[in-house]
Design a protein with these regions (language model features):
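Acidic Ser/Thr/Pro-rich low-complexity disordered segments
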Residues: 35-40, 74-78, 124-130
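Sec-dependent signal peptide recognition
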Residues: 2-8
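Short, solvent-exposed loop/hinge segments that bridge or flank secondary-structure elements
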Residues: 21-59
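N-terminal signal peptide c-region/cleavage motif recognized by signal peptidases
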Residues: 14-17
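Glycine-rich, aromatic-bearing surface loops/beta-hairpins
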Residues: 106-154
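Sequence contexts marking disulfide-bonded cysteines in secreted/extracellular proteins
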Residues: 25-27, 82-84, 91-97, 121-123, ...
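Disulfide-bonded cysteine motifs in exported proteins
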Residues: 21-22, 47-51, 78, 87, ...
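Contiguous, well-ordered beta-strand patches that form the walls/edges
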Residues: 32, 59-116
Length: 154
């Protein structure tokens, strides 16, 4: 009986946690010319993603800041919002129907799935929008030192 309980406990511990302690952090990826040449339909040239816990009053959620550098654009798309835990990670949403991303954070990296995301512009018509195209849907981001996200603003 003890072996069965121990085996069950080990199986549970081996499963990936929804968000867990690996969620907060800074994740980034810059695509080099060679990668972009192999993926001519990829619009995103760089991604920075910060996931963090807000002040204690909202400690049951994660918040996020994201910045996307895009081919042919001088200004990056910047956005932010709230993340809810899911069975596989986090669902991060931008207010005012600004879309969102699904993020699976891990100790050394994160996977980000993009359908559609825009800058926060509840009352503006000029919000930038990024739609996950052929080569802009799935991103593997490297976990980096939090200092890489220090300049990001909400």
């Amino acid at each position: 009986m003890n072996r069965i309980v121990l085996a069950g406990l080990l199986l549970i511990l081996a499963l990936p946690a929804a968000a867990g302690p690996d969620a907060p952090g800074c994740f980034t990826r810059t695509y080099d010319r060679a990668h972009l040449a192999q993926h001519p339909d990829q619009v995103v040239t760089a991604v920075t993603l910060r996931i963090y816990r807000p002040p204690p009053a909202n400690a049951d959620k994660y918040w996020f800041l994201a910045q996307f550098r895009l081919r042919g654009k001088d200004k990056p798309l910047r956005t932010s919002g709230i993340c809810n835990e899911t069975a596989s990670g986090l669902r991060c949403l931008v207010e005012c129907d600004g879309g969102g991303v699904d993020v699976v954070p891990r100790a050394r990296d994160a996977t980000m799935h993009l359908d559609r995301i825009s800058g926060p512009a509840c009352d503006e018509d000029s919000a930038q929008e990024l739609t996950g195209g052929k080569d802009d849907r799935l991103f593997r981001l490297d976990r980096v030192n939090d200092a890489a996200c220090a300049g990001m603003k909400r």
